[in-house]
Amino acid sequence: MFKILCSTGALLGKSNNRDYKLLKELSTKLTCDGFEFMMYTAWYEEVEALITALKEMQLYIPVMHCEKHIGEAISKGEFDEAYRRFDINCYIAGEIGAESIVVHLWDGITSDAHFENNLAAYGKLKDIADKYGIKLLIENVVCNQEDPMKHWCELKERFPEVHFVFDTKMAAFHSQMDLLY
């Protein structure tokens, strides 16, 4: 029932130019049940090549993590760009067989300074994810105004169907680890 997933973000970074082609070799060196595929901004230029490469690798990828600037765009009120990028991320997720997609609903320097933008955007993001048959998961990202748990409660109140993913590093930053139990 439970699976141990490795984030591809732990394997691909600046030191190896975030070369997704390295996943084929690197994935064989790990003992895990599957992967959370982490999307990066640089890959928007080559979406089809990315999808083809991932399919050829035949990795089990039940979860995709959206490119992190989506939440920052939402926070800044750049909704059209955020929705465009999120749609691309959902398309990729669907093509590689992911069942769920993680998004930072707020992020960057703006973070949760305009949480009303982030709250307003959730419904549209959910509609886009639903179009691809993918479950949307909201991560407890670090805040610079309030805290993630407060925002999760606001989301749950307004959207009872919302699903979350709990990042222990983010929770520790806000001293919210105990709230999981």
Locations of the language-model features?
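N-terminal pre-domain/capping segments
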Residues: M1-C90, G94, D130, F159, ...
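Active-site-proximal loop/turn and secondary-structure-junction residues that shape catalytic pockets
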Residues: A10-L12, M39-W43, E67-I70, L105-I109, ...
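Acidic/histidine-rich catalytic cores of soluble enzymes
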Residues: G34-F35, I128-Y181
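Active-site-adjacent beta->alpha loops and helix N-cap segments on the catalytic face
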Residues: W43-A53, T110-A121
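Short, electropositive alpha-helical surface patch
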Residues: K55, Y60, H114-D127, C153-V162
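Short glycine/serine/threonine/alanine-rich loop segments
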Residues: L59, A98, I134
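Active-site groove signature of glycoside hydrolases
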Residues: N89, A93-A113, L137
